[in-house]
């Protein structure tokens, strides 16, 4: 039985998610930024529904998270997804933005960081995202570090992703996670992946090939009293991947151009991502869809394995 507080004033559960948590079924949280900021309407709605479908196909219940009317939506209905997808100007809400958006009663599209806040409050132990934020290149001067990394240290949620984007300093990102004692497990891969690229060039601290062992490892982390996330990475399918050296060359050139144009801070990431998309002639669109689907599917599989573990140990 779930220990979730279904009467929490800041949470609005869908009936399906509420029933799943109450009866101990596996649930996977999903962000809503992909709906409000990822693709144009109606492609954004179709993509969100496709992501939910692959979670269901693995035997888990999807819980897409948004913010509306002063509460987190824990499990968005088709009507919710349609409304968010068709509405222009919904702000992207990271962890720091949550209090103000909730207080004002507005809408917000959740990022990795804010989705983890909501998932942890709701008692959902798994979250899927195509890729996480990290330490930006030049962070030793700019101090530009994604809130995702900080939130990992605060939220008791397993995060399934295809690593971090190549535009980041992936070496420093891994160093930060090590310093914060956030476990990194690469599923059926030796290397830490880099979103569009199967390998970042950095080895993963741990490789595990069995979903049951991954599930046990996650639970062991929490049984040790840790309140932090566990990061599970899985690389993009080989047929959809983009060569690491090609991407690195594009990023270096684009970063120099961005510096020349005075583009920094929040504007740097979309600038670099657009540069990669242009230079690869849109191959990043296919790659992005690939990792959205594959990470959601793996999260569903691992959530089921984790539920099986809890049931075997009478903890579900």
Curated annotation (Swiss-Prot):
- InterPro entries with a match to the protein in the record: Indigdn_synthA-like (IPR022830), PsuG (IPR007342)
- Kindly state a single biological-process term from the GO annotations of this entry: nucleobase catabolic process
Naming one, the record's GO cellular component terms include: cytoplasm
- Which residues hold substrate? 92, 112, 146-148
Q: Which cysteines are joined by disulfide bonds?
A: none
**Origin superkingdom:** Bacteria
| Active site feature | 31 (proton donor), 165 (nucleophile)
Q: Name one GO molecular function term.
A: pseudouridylate synthase activity
Q: Where does Mn(2+) bind?
A: 144
Assigned keywords, A-Z: Glycosidase, Hydrolase, Lyase, Manganese, Metal-binding
Q: What is its EC number?
A: 4.2.1.70
Query: What's its catalytic activity?
Result: D-ribose 5-phosphate + uracil = psi-UMP + H2O
Which Pfam families does this UniProt record tie to the protein? Indigoidine_A
Function, in words: Catalyzes the reversible cleavage of pseudouridine 5'-phosphate (PsiMP) to ribose 5-phosphate and uracil. Functions biologically in the cleavage direction, as part of a pseudouridine degradation pathway.
**The protein's name:** Pseudouridine-5'-phosphate glycosidase
